[in-house]
């Protein structure tokens, strides 16, 4: 089955066809390291983490490059506010980013280049553009001639003539055209700078990714990714620079993930709804955040709310509870016939095929997770129907299906914990917020068992209701009565 990926450049889904067979070269725009990362950064990191994991699951070799912008106007401004150097500030927040990523359980990219370590590569491209009359120096700055690239606007779908007609006359008299953008910025007092043929200065933002992607992936590579907010002007300008300098296509496929809102509002510090990754992980297990993010296909908008996170937690707990229950099954009797129906067996035998069909359709994690959740329902139903001495065929089917589900869930970073430990830690965390202890719950359960043994159904129901009021749900099964906390975080 071919993987079909939505390409922003063409505006349609296309088969993924790596330039080098079975080797995908991927470049993703990383953070500007001046502050703590927020949930939007988490979505970006997790989306491309999922893509890399899935491609490797399919036995593709993946070279994954994600950069750090460690010199920028925002970094300089924040450094001046806090009284530290731009380098020290950038390094601090790169370290914070790595901590966040480790806590989220993301794979490290193969290469994580920093802009400040690739100044010469940027100067080289700028010089190539100047030599081609596609860029010009002006008072220590260097600007890209937008009109020199006829295809400008092909990624964002913007018409350069319309943009120029709507542009105000540039306040910057050093520009020939208001649409021209900076490749190199002349140094200012107190700012970091590097020597160049045009005098001391620092690179513009857009040239950084053109230089780093060319160094590590070549002039033409497979996939360039980022958020939809980067399509224009950042990625549009990258194409103009790179294709102008190299004379060949830049990235063949452009992947852009959707925005994250908070209760249907754009996230912003002024609205007081700015959620950092640290904030979220203080309240939720990282796999809950993953289950939430992957409940929506990566290109679609994603709205963060406590209710949505509770739904994600409920789904994740069901996965872990099922994993735990199946792991406890005995081997079974090889002489007994299977009880699982042919219909359910066929569904379980097709889990991987249906999961791949979903993922091959532009990495549709929402549909892929739906396949796993549906399989869990079948497994739970089949497990409840097992006798005290189950058929070995049924046990083999259930254990094999659960092992496969755990493997596939790992592609989106779920079911990575020991099931018993995950469920126990969750119980302890949830109990810390309500007025009952685990020992008291177990005491109530024993009282209820005694009542049921004496056929005192009224007392049995009364105990269940008492526990429900305290946020405890009982679950009767073949192995006894279990319980879970149903109150929200």
UniProtKB/Swiss-Prot annotation:
InterPro entries: Cys-tRNA-ligase (IPR015803), Cys-tRNA-synt_Ia_DALR (IPR015273), Cys-tRNA/MSH_ligase (IPR024909), Rossmann-like_a/b/a_fold (IPR014729), tRNA-synt_1_cat_dom (IPR032678), tRNAsynth_Ia_anticodon-bd (IPR009080). One of its GO terms (cellular component) is cytosol. The keyword Protein biosynthesis applies. CDD domains: Anticodon_Ia_Cys, CysRS_core. It catalyses: tRNA(Cys) + L-cysteine + ATP = L-cysteinyl-tRNA(Cys) + AMP + diphosphate. It comes from the Bacteria. Zn(2+) binds at residues 29, 209, 234, 238. GO terms for molecular function: ATP binding; cysteine-tRNA ligase activity; zinc ion binding. A motif ('HIGH' region) lies at residues 31-41. Its EC number is 6.1.1.16. Keywords: Aminoacyl-tRNA synthetase, ATP-binding, Cytoplasm, Ligase, Metal-binding, Nucleotide-binding, Protein biosynthesis, Zinc. It is found in: Cytoplasm. Its cofactor is Zn(2+). A motif ('KMSKS' region) lies at residues 266-270. ATP binds at residue 269. Belongs to the class-I aminoacyl-tRNA synthetase family. PANTHER family: CYSTEINE--TRNA LIGASE, CYTOPLASMIC, CYSTEINYL-TRNA SYNTHETASE. This is Cysteine--tRNA ligase. It comes from Desulfotalea psychrophila (strain LSv54 / DSM 12343). The gene is cysS.
